[in-house]
């Protein structure tokens, strides 16, 4: 189908943009559903199912908890002096020594996990007048009775248990972590059999702190053949400070100290397989890529990870507004520029030209405007990732039953943070999408205005993204318009002449329509006059009588 007004002396040039048959729906600030030619998913919703051991050093706890490894449970001796970035605790971990409790378990676990090491230094504590290295059949080390390797169970020597008063200064330039404990016998008889005194006492102090523990004698549920318990405590001694231990019984003494380090190490509960692979981000479900700014896999993370959000999907537009082409038009059909719809099949650019002239029809992309849009869009994903991904980890939180209110508050804070990030993510993506669409629309308008300024009075804006060129414009001429070298002065006289001729024809065609309407109106008027005259004549002759009743 030829374009209106197109012959050898004129041409038509349309500007358009890329379109696809089925676009992607995204959200903007002004519209919840707008179709674009291309978009990328911003939310990571799945993990690899395995924990990668690179670049982070992963220590598999296997059947040991971190605290059991710290104390020196016989079946955890393999972890002595180990280091890690992430300690992975398994659900099948168990204790296999004398039953114990840690009143401040969560704090100790977190402290040791963040230190990233079980490096232990033995010190020469002097325990005079007592028996050292006590053991239990609940804590077998091989065939013999044993005990936690990092602790020293002190009992009576003969029939005496003297008051112990031991000091240990910290002359180093780092913090030292001392682990110690108090034994709670199950009966009074067991108390006197082990420590002579009917009631013991343990006091551990530094210049900054002091703890005094009185044993609670009484039977408890049997665990590994024992109804007694050991309570584990810990003390940090700063450089220049002194550790003082005073006791008259029931002391589970330290054998030395753990060297504390500061760092980004952590701990995570997971049953995911540890494999040889590379991933910066780890969750209990397994490692996940961090090439997206958001994730919906797990709230608990370690490493450089996407932010956790509630949404399962957030689409970032990386293409322009999509207006699918009407397929019934052919190449030009009834002339469709960018104002009416987009063009499919533009594989070499986002913006371009279609023309029809004496040499036929053609299409070409405008690489300059395409590149301008792409350059501004390409960095969007990286910029969003930079705003959201950080070198941080979200650790698990544990609280004892008596800290229930603190746990509720912590959960509320975490849920609020997730709500805020989910909202921020929604707004951030909507803003970026709005900017992308406005940007691509702007580049189309810039190209159209640039073409209009070149053609000037040599062409007429047809109102739909096309120009009618009023001079002969072969393919070389069309190319000069596309590349910006068109000289309108060269074609001005020809264009003016052709414009007057074409407008004149259109004007004459318009006069015919006016004449027809005027003739029709005059004919109707004359018919009415004749009819009225006949009625008046008939009334005068008496052939027609007209009665008017009031």
UniProtKB/Swiss-Prot annotation:
What GO terms are given for molecular function? Answer: host cell surface receptor binding
Which stretch is the leader sequence?
none
Instruction: Report the locations given in the UniProt record.
Output: Virion membrane; Host apical cell membrane
Q: Which UniProt keywords apply?
A: Clathrin- and caveolin-independent endocytosis of virus by host, Clathrin-mediated endocytosis of virus by host, Disulfide bond, Fusion of virus membrane with host endosomal membrane, Fusion of virus membrane with host membrane, Glycoprotein, Hemagglutinin, Host cell membrane, Host membrane, Host-virus interaction, Lipoprotein, Membrane, Palmitate, Transmembrane, Transmembrane helix, Viral attachment to host cell, Viral envelope protein, Viral penetration into host cytoplasm, Virion, Virus endocytosis by host, Virus entry into host cell
Topology of the protein relative to the lipid bilayer: Single-pass type I membrane protein
- Segments crossing the lipid bilayer: 515-535
More about this protein = Major glycoprotein, comprises over 80% of the envelope proteins present in virus particle.
What is the protein's name according to its record? Hemagglutinin
């Amino acid at each position: 189908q030829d374009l209106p007004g197109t012959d050898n002396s004129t041409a038509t040039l349309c500007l358009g943009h890329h379109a696809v048959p089925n676009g992607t729906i995204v959200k903007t600030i002004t519209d919840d559903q707008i179709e674009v030619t291309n978009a990328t998913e911003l939310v990571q919703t799945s993990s690899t199912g395995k924990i990668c051991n690179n670049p982070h050093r992963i220590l598999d706890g296997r059947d040991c908890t971190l605290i059991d490894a710290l104390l020196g449970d016989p079946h955890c001796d393999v972890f002595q002096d180990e280091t890690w970035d992430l300690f992975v605790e398994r659900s099948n971990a168990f204790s296999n020594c004398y039953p114990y409790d840690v009143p401040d378990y969560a704090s100790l676990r977190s402290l040791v996990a963040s230190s990233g090491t079980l490096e232990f230094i033995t010190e020469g504590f002097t325990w005079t007048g007592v028996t050292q290295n006590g053991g239990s059949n609940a804590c077998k080390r091989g065939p013999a009775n044993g005990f936690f390797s990092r602790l020293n169970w002190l009992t009576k020597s003969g029939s005496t248990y003297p008051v112990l008063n031991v000091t240990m200064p910290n002359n180093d330039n780092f913090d030292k972590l001392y682990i110690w404990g108090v034994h709670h016998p199950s009966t009074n008889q067991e108390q006197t059999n082990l420590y002579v005194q009917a009631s013991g006492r343990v006091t551990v102090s530094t210049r900054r702190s002091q703890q005094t523990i009185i044993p609670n004698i009484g039977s408890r549920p049997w665990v590994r053949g024992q109804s007694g318990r050991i309570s584990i405590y810990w003390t940090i001694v700063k450089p220049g400070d002194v550790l003082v231990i005073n006791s008259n019984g029931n002391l589970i003494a330290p054998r030395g100290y753990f060297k504390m380090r500061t760092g980004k190490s952590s701990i995570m509960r997971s049953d995911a397989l540890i494999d040889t692979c590379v991933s910066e981000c780890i969750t209990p479900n397994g490692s996940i890529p961090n090439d997206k700014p958001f994730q919906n896999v797990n709230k608990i993370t370690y490493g450089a990870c996407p932010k956790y959000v509630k949404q399962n999907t957030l689409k970032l537009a990386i293409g322009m507004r999509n207006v699918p082409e009407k397929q019934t038009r052919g190449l030009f059909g009834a002339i469709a520029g960018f104002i009416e719809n987009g063009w499919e099949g533009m594989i070499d650019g986002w913006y371009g030209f279609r023309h029809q002239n004496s040499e036929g029809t053609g299409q070409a992309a405008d690489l300059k405007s395409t590149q301008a849009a792409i350059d501004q869009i390409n960095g969007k994903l990286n910029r969003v990732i930079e705003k959201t991904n950080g070198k941080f980890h979200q650790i698990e939180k544990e609280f004892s039953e008596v800290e229930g209110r603190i746990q509720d508050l912590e959960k509320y804070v975490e849920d609020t943070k997730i709500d805020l990030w989910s909202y921020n993510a929604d707004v951030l993506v909507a803003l970026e999408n709005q900017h992308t669409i406005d940007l691509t629309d702007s580049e189309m308008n810039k190209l159209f205005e640039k073409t209009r300024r070149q053609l000037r009075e040599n062409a007429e804006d047809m109102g739909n993204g096309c120009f009618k060129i009023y001079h002969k414009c072969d393919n070389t001429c069309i190319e000069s318009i596309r590349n910006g070298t068109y000289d309108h002065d060269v074609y001005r006289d020809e264009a003016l002449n052709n414009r007057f001729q074409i407008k004149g024809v259109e004007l004459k065609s318009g006069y015919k329509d006016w004449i027809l309407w005027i003739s029709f109106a005059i004919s109707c008027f004359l018919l009415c006059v004749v009819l009225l005259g006949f009625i008046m004549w008939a009334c005068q002759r008496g052939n027609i009588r007209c009665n008017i009743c009031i």
